[in-house]
């Protein structure tokens, strides 16, 4: 006879699967987008208006004051009310409806910028929104040169950027770039029109170094390198703009250099720390780069020497002389030491004492 236990287990398991399938077939789960400040009404799936239901938000029961029959009413929603909302039937707690509420705003006009930092290879365009929407956005960009639509290859990083390769150099035909941003609550767009030469802007110079010039207290030697992104400095040379100032002042001094990647500052204040930056630009077209990373340097200063003053010499001589003077000799009687009979008496007394000692030793 077959064991009835496995058969019973199979029946129970089948029943669980059927109930699970029924519950999920009865529920409607999706994402619902609403604007900040809107009034939101949620219906509990196919349940009647007067059905007994329970609503939860992120697993927490919602007070009945927000219900109109079986409908959930949310007034003037804000960002904090985003989350998962679920509706259950009566006391059985059968899930009848589930939605994820996303509260946000439609996009404002995007900020679009196009620039060529590797001329003549091509240019790139980057964009961002002036303020967050709090919900997902999608961006679409189109680039048209004359009657030709060009491909803008999206960069992996940063994600809101793409680059375009020049198909024709020195063209007088303008480029037209249109960016459209869309989300579940609306869309917006912006357009740029420009000449090829107008967007040329190199990256800042690299490896800027400033150091003092030996034996020159008013000079600083500054050197730098072309930006590594500039592909052909021989055919498309750069010129440079140097600015510098001592930290004690706010006013910059400037020098424009048409060639070379070094310069000697000759009017620095001796002993004062300087801050120095360099910018770059194509010799003929485009605009100046941003400033390089600031470097600091101080002009050469002479090592202080030990100077001995005349007073120090006198004191040293006096001290040395006194240290080698013989100790004073005590005299029994000095002719000029005493004044009057008192002094004479002292001398005679001392003489008699010495004479007495002499007699004893004879």
From Swiss-Prot:
Gene3D superfamilies: Immunoglobulins. Glycans are attached at residues 58, 68, 140, 188. GO terms for molecular function: interleukin-11 binding; interleukin-11 receptor activity. It is found in: Cell membrane. The gene is CNTFR. Highly expressed in nervous system. Also found in skeletal muscle. Heterotrimer of the alpha subunit, LIFR and IL6ST. One of its GO terms (biological process) is ciliary neurotrophic factor-mediated signaling pathway. Residues 23-103 form the Ig-like C2-type domain. A motif (WSXWS motif) lies at residues 288-292. Disulfide bonds join 44-87. Belongs to the type I cytokine receptor family. Type 3 subfamily. It is a lipid-anchor; GPI-anchor. This is Ciliary neurotrophic factor receptor subunit alpha. Its main location: membrane. The WSXWS motif appears to be necessary for proper protein folding and thereby efficient intracellular transport and cell-surface receptor binding. Binds to CNTF (GPA). The alpha subunit provides the receptor specificity. GO terms for cellular component: ciliary neurotrophic factor receptor complex; CNTFR-CLCF1 complex; external side of plasma membrane. Residues 1-19 form the signal peptide. Residues 106-203, 204-304 form the Fibronectin type-III domain. A lipid is attached at residue 334 (GPI-anchor amidated aspartate). Keywords: Cell membrane, Disulfide bond, Glycoprotein, GPI-anchor, Immunoglobulin domain, Lipoprotein, Membrane, Receptor, Repeat, Signal. Residues 335-362 form a propeptide.
């Amino acid at each position: 006879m077959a064991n009835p236990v496995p058969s019973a287990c199979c029946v129970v398991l089948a029943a669980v699967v059927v109930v699970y399938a029924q519950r999920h077939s009865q529920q409607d789960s999706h994402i619902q987008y609403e604007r900040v400040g809107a009034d939101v009404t949620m219906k509990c799936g196919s349940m009647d208006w007067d059905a007994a239901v329970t609503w939860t938000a992120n697993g927490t029961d919602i007070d009945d004051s927000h219900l109109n029959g079986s409908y959930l009413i949310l007034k003037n929603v804000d960002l904090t009310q985003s989350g998962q909302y679920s509706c259950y039937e009566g006391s059985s707690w059968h899930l009848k409806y589930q939605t994820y509420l996303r509260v946000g705003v439609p996009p404002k006009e995007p900020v679009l910028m196009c620039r060529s930092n590797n001329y003549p290879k091509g240019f790139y365009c980057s964009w961002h929104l002036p303020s967050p929407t709090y919900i997902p956005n999608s961006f679409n960009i189109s680039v048209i040169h004359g009657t030709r639509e060009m491909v803008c290859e999206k960069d992996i990083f940063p994600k809101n950027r793409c680059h375009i390769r020049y198909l024709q150099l020195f063209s007088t035909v303008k480029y037209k770039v249109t960016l459209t941003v869309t989300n579940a609550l609306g869309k917006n767009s912006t357009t740029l029109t420009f000449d090829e030469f107008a967007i040329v802007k190199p990256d800042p110079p690299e490896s800027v170094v400033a150091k003092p010039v030996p034996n020159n207290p008013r000079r600083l030697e500054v050197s730098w390198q072309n930006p590594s992104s500039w592909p052909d400095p021989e055919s498309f040379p750069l010129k440079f703009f140097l600015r510098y100032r001592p930290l004690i002042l706010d006013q910059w001094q400037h020098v424009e250099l048409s060639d070379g990647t070094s310069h000697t500052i000759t009017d620095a204040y001796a002993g004062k720390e300087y801050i120095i930056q360099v910018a770059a630009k194509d010799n003929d077209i485009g605009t100046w780069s941003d400033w390089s990373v600031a470097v600091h340097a101080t002009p050469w200063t002479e090592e202080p020497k030990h100077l001995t003053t005349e007073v120090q010499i006198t004191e040293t001589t006096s001290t040395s002389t006194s240290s080698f003077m013989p100790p004073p000799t005590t005299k029994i009687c000095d002719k000029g030491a005493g004044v009057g009979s008192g002094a004479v008496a002292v001398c005679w007394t001392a003489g008699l004492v010495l004479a007495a000692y002499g007699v004893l030793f004879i």
